[in-house]
Amino acid sequence: MARKKISVIGAGNVGATVAQFLATKELGDVYLFDVVDGIPEGKALDIQEGAPHWGYDLDVVGFSTSDSSNYKNMEGSDVIVVTAGMARKPGMSREDLFDKNVEIIADVSKNIKKYSPDSIIVVVSNPADIMAYALQKISGVDPQRIMGLGGSLDSSRFRTFLAKELDVSVEDVNAFVIGGHGDDMVPFIRYSSVAGIPIEKLLPKEKIDAIVKRTRFGGGEIVNYLKAGSAYYAPGISITAMVESVIKDKKRVIPCAAYITGKHAEHYGINNKFIGVPIKIGERGVEEIYDIDFLPEELELWKKSVASVEASSKNVDEWLKKHPQ
């Protein structure tokens, strides 16, 4: 049986880490792309040379897109992971990256449209939900085949902080985060539990509030430690979980940025935009979107997140008017 093909656009810390995780989990041949000459080739070779110890028999190869014709090597990809873009620095929000990253996403989108429009696409470049929207608008790819990182990573952080506070295994913590992948994300307390026991029965409100706040600013906490660059290990494995569910058709339910339309638009109060909600991920991409009910106070938080995503998506529309693709 032919191996799957996974292309990773961007060979920085996140892209290279994703490539390594994809290889070690033997999800398919990995094609690594970057605009800087030598970086994707060197990192791909480095990952390939670790194969004897990890035991993976697959190809990891790199291509520099300073020669744009090298994008043709992503043709026929089962999954494309888009990590290309500027990294956050201390004091920056994900939204501050918009101007730089939308230009990069525009170039990537046109090449996806040209060489591999039928791939499932995972958008990681920040702000991920907004860049997913830009990519879909420019590439014309079926939005069901596009999902953005956000809730997968934010939920992993939320679960980690809860597990550490309670001194329990992370495997027994069920919790998720919805909304935009920014400071207005919504960690959902009411659906959070440990082995089925509601979090609110295990922790006092002030502890929960502190964990929610830390989750919202979890990425910034790491940026402040690193000074230059942002998180990549937790994003890398969060992305890999999404890709694995596509490649193996696992039907995992993971909160991710998905395109909201139809009956879901009426429920969530946002239409034809990407925002983080619980979705089922399989070989066809976003195979189902789950509507969750809100209590009044939860709805207010959700509406704030929606407003933030709507405003940033409008920036994409305005940018596209000035820069027709």
Swiss-Prot record:
Keywords annotated in UniProt: NAD, Oxidoreductase, Tricarboxylic acid cycle
Active site per the UniProt annotation: 181 (proton acceptor)
SUPFAM superfamilies membership: LDH C-terminal domain-like, NAD(P)-binding Rossmann-fold domains
GO MF annotations, alphabetized: L-lactate dehydrogenase activity; L-malate dehydrogenase (NAD+) activity
Binding site for NAD(+): 10-15, 34, 101, 124-126
Pfam families reported for this sequence: Ldh_1_C, Ldh_1_N
Amino acids binding substrate: 88, 94, 126, 157
Domain of life: Archaea
Keyword field contains tRNA processing: no
Any Gene Ontology biological process: tricarboxylic acid cycle
Record's keyword annotation contains Oxidoreductase: yes
Reactions that this protein is recorded to catalyse: (S)-malate + NAD(+) = oxaloacetate + NADH + H(+)
EC number: 1.1.1.37
Biological role stated in the UniProt entry: Catalyzes the reversible oxidation of malate to oxaloacetate.
Protein family according to the UniProt entry: Belongs to the LDH/MDH superfamily.
Matches recorded under PANTHER family: L-2-HYDROXYCARBOXYLATE DEHYDROGENASE (NAD(P)(+)) (PTHR43128), L-LACTATE DEHYDROGENASE (PTHR43128:SF16)
Name the UniProt record assigns to this protein: Malate dehydrogenase
Protein encoded by which gene: mdh
